[in-house]
Amino acid sequence: MIKLKPAPILNLGAPGSGKTTALVTILADPDLKLIYLSTDPNGEQSLLHALTEVYKIPEAQWKNRIFAHTVEPGAADWDTLLQVSETISLKNYQGLAQESGIEKAGFRQYIELINVCKNFTCSWTGTRLGDLTFVPPGHVLAFDGLSGLSTMARDLSIGAKPSLHEGEWNVAMNTVERF
């Protein structure tokens, strides 16, 4: 018997084009379950909207078949925004480029994302699926948020710093590629 390898699928589209909504079609196969990992702050809400409003699937049909977790990119607080604004007002681009990072400790969401992938736990049910390197048979892993991943990688490199120099950009893109 030939052992088939699941096909990797890349679902690209503009914001609001229906990428998250399309994930619900996976549930048409009663033998499949969806692991939904999002970096979009509204991702889980969009998925729930697709389930309940677009496709109108009764909760009993999907409740034990979807496992979701979201890790949002960091956001600067008011004090950090003030610090960044003061720095911008006092330095030219060269001076900004020489900064080693601003408030990097507040932008470690990329590390959180790796930990979630290492030991995935559904935020809806508390179900632990473990290491996502090996997706369980009968499950489909959907990662919703390349933009969020890129933002997290950049923020890991520079924090809230308002500019990147070429080396910092290289570090951020290498981080995305390794993910």
Identify the residue ranges that each predicted region occupies.
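Conserved P-loop
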Residues: I2-C122, F134-P137, G148
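Intrinsically disordered, low-complexity domain-flanking/linker segments in eukaryotic proteins
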Residues: T125-G126
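P-loop NTPase motor core
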Residues: G130-F179
